[in-house]
Design a protein with these regions (language model features):
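N-terminal active-site segment of His-dependent metallophosphoesterases
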Residues: 1-68, 72, 361-372, 376
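Divalent metal-coordination and catalytic microenvironments
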Residues: 8, 28, 43, 48, ...
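Glycine-rich phosphate-binding loop signature in dinucleotide/nucleotide-binding domains
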Residues: 35-39, 119-121, 162-165, 284-286
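Accessory, non-catalytic peripheral segments of nucleic-acid enzymes
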Residues: 37, 42, 247-379
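His/Asp/Glu-rich metal-coordinating catalytic cores
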Residues: 55, 84-218
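A short helix->loop->beta-strand "cap" motif at the edges of active sites that frequently abuts
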Residues: 72-77, 166
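Hydrophobic or amphipathic alpha-helical targeting/insertion segments
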Residues: 75-80, 102-103
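Binuclear metal-dependent phosphoesterase catalytic core
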Residues: 112-124, 129, 222-287
Length: 379
């Protein structure tokens, strides 16, 4: 049985205020063409279908179009919500969609139930596990000792018992310890949301989403497929692809990657203003790519961004790297941290973990706690 493993579409994404919707449709059309030339039995979508919990209408229409195209090809789709998605919104209409063999993970309420497909080698059981936080799992099992993401996932999978005689596939969206991340993903502070790769050992293939770089974690069959597009300049050197997975008889798994070619690459350029505006250096190059340009001139160039965009219309970011900026970076880094109050440090941490700022009431409560702690220490 052959699968296409996709994740992290991040439909509706904006990079440096540039909308990615046209590029996303372009790459989805390319994926559909690959499916036409590389037939599969089902498509796995491992979370972060959208970039935000409340996606723009254009992003919703784009996903609707893509799922409809997959349905026209009579392909079952197995999709889960990721940390960027609203699980409730993604699950809307899931019972109706299932009648068209588009299976969407419900809002988490307990261990996933298998959905079974069959081929010449027998049954394949697919389990859909949306992005989990410890609080979600504690709500289902209030007496379980759940203090971490690892505890939460372990509890859920302890209640999930794949038939050892069947081939089993899990679609999930978590940080797995040992995987490499990049800056375009939601930051992890102190690794508190990582989970142990050994928790997935009972599954023949684990289709992971969350990390943007295609990679295996430990074994070949525990795998992130990565994003179909580059979403930050930390990904500039990556080669994006889609992952094809073939399950033979029990224990036999073959994995292959097919490269994707974007409408606009996302690249970094470096040099002096004179070098980058010299026609001999840019003629014949992809000047309409999404670019981060670093100028090495010692003096700022007046209206450099506007002038460079005459040649490079999709210039997203402009920086300088010279003696002045290097000195400023050395001086600013410790000063910025020292200037922040304890509440500001906690607010930064909270936003990183929850993708939303503290409310006024929460900030007041936290400040009261901080003051109480300081009073106790002074006493």
């Amino acid at each position: 049985m052959r699968f296409l493993h996709l994740s992290d579409l991040h439909l509706g994404k904006r990079v440096c205020e540039f909308s990615m919707l046209d590029d996303q449709r372009y790459i989805l059309e390319q994926i559909l063409s690959l499916l036409d030339s590389h037939p599969v039995d089902a498509v796995l979508l491992a979370g972060d279908l959208y970039d935000k919990p409340v996606p723009p209408a254009e992003a919703v229409r784009l996903l609707d179009w893509f799922l409809t195209e997959l349905s026209h090809r009579e392909l079952p789709v197995f999709a889960i919500s990721g940390n960027h998605d609203s699980a409730d919104r993604v699950a809307f209409g899931s019972a109706l969609l299932a009648e068209s063999r588009v299976y969407v993970s419900p809002v988490f309420s307990g261990p996933p139930e298998p959905i079974t497909l069959t081929d010449a080698h027998g049954p394949v059981d697919l389990y859909l596990l949306p992005f989990l936080k410890p609080a979600m799992v504690r709500h289902v099992w209030p007496d379980a000792p759940i203090e971490s993401y690892n505890d939460a996932l372990a509890c859920v999978l302890d209640h999930c018992s794949p038939d050892p005689a069947h081939r089993s596939v899990l679609v999930a969206h978590q940080f797995v310890a040992g995987a490499a991340s990049c800056e375009s993903e939601e930051p992890s502070v102190g690794g508190i949301d990582w989970v142990d790769a050994a928790l997935f050992d009972k599954f023949d293939y684990v289709a992971l989403g969350h990390l943007h770089s295609p990679q295996k974690v430990g074994r070949d069959t525990l795998r992130y497929c990565g994003t179909p597009l580059k979403y930050s300049f930390s990904e500039a050197s990556q080669h994006k692809s889609v992952t094809f997975v073939e399950l033979g008889e029990k224990g036999s798994v073959t994995i292959a990657a097919e490269p994707l070619v974007p409408q606009h690459d996302l690249r970094e350029l470096r040099g002096s203003y004179m070098e980058l505006t010299d026609r001999r250096n840019y003629e014949g190059t992809a000047v309409d790519d999404y670019l981060h340009i670093t100028l090495t001139d010692e003096q700022d160039i007046p209206e450099a961004l506007a002038r460079l965009r005459v040649i490079y219309p999709n210039l997203m970011r402009l920086d300088y790297d010279n003696r002045r900026t290097q000195t400023r970076q050395e001086l600013d880094a410790p000063a910025k941290a020292e200037q922040k109050t304890p509440l500001e440090h906690f607010a930064d941490f909270y936003q990183l973990q929850n993708n939303q700022p503290l409310t006024h009431e929460q900030a007041v409560f936290c400040q009261q706690l901080i003051e109480t702690i300081w009073k106790e220490e002074d006493a």
